[in-house]
Amino acid sequence: MRFKMNIKKSKRAKSFLFILVFMALHCRLLPRFAGSSDFDEAILEEMQARRIPSVVACIIKNTDIVWMRSYGLADKEISIPATDQTIYLLASISQTVIATAVMQLAEKGLIDIDQDVGLYLPFPVRNPNYPQSIVTPRMLLTHSSGLAGPKTDDELPGFYDWFSPDAAPPLAQTLMDYLLPGGSSYVPAVWKESAPGRMELYSNLGVTLLAYMVEFVSGEEFSSYCREHIFLPLGMPGTSYKIADLNPENLAVWYLENTQPIPHYTRRDYPAGQVKSSVSELAHFLAAWMNGGAYKEVRILNSDTAAEALRLHNPASGLCLLWNLMIGGWYGHSGGVNGASTYMEFHKQDKVGLIILSNMYLESENPIYPPAGKIYGLIRQYANQFRGPA
């Protein structure tokens, strides 16, 4: 089934007390007791103001969750509260899973991210405007291949159509239809007037191509590869691209910005945004990246491989290999799509990270996104208390 998308005793002592009171009264981003009822109330007030059904969040130190909260309802219609087991759509956070899979293959010597991506596919990949220039996996990992986003469904008609859960067309079909000249949905606008490797242009199509490369080289369907080689080894059985793998009782309802519920769906570019997970399980994945590719006794990447993925490629934007390096040494990724607003980040040196998930996307002034989001600001301020040695 297919359907269209709707598109935070001395004068000195008295002065210090005055400062604390002033901050609590006049800066809602800085509640006096972070993690207390004041803290929770500040988050709930922001949720109510923006009509957000639920928010779940956690802070990780080293490999342990040191704080976790669930606010609001996973299902408003029948008043099911959100919990740390509620499964949310992760949206573009999913791209860090693609980066993990690609770097696993590179680590095994099955691909070279600086060679022609066509070497690892059953068809060539060339920008017709620059036919002599190769497109490499690294370019795709840094959104610099020259491929369209697309920004809107008009740019590549039908690319962002919705499908019933787990029923998206095969990746090979999507890519041959949209990417190859002569494909049923091919339009010249799929390639931009930018030579491969020259300009950063965010591309869901490009990261979907990476996912298909993983599928073709490994011989495993992409969602199955991720489940077997990333999620299950990390102790994440309630995490998958496929809804069929998950407990339906734990799935959050997805909502539009107008608070209307929408059916669970998938898209042609599902690798770029369709991982579903809970905050408690996603913490394992974030902890692995925060600790050089290992979560407790499980290693999904060698430390050198993880370091390469986190190496800065574009100082202007902070882009690494699908991860973003931000001011202060924090690496993160956001996600936003109908039914979800998500964000996660970690500080590599201090080994502290945070995750925020919600079951509604807000187009503007989203409170869970940095730098100005109120909910993000509250949680980030609390996370800062865990920086430094354990």
Model regions and ranges:
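Hydrophobic h-region of N-terminal signal peptides that target proteins for export
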Residues: 20-28
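A short, well-structured edge-of-sheet supersecondary motif
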Residues: 48-81, 113, 170-180, 237-240, ...
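Short, well-structured active-site flanking segments
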Residues: 77, 97, 103-122, 217-245, ...
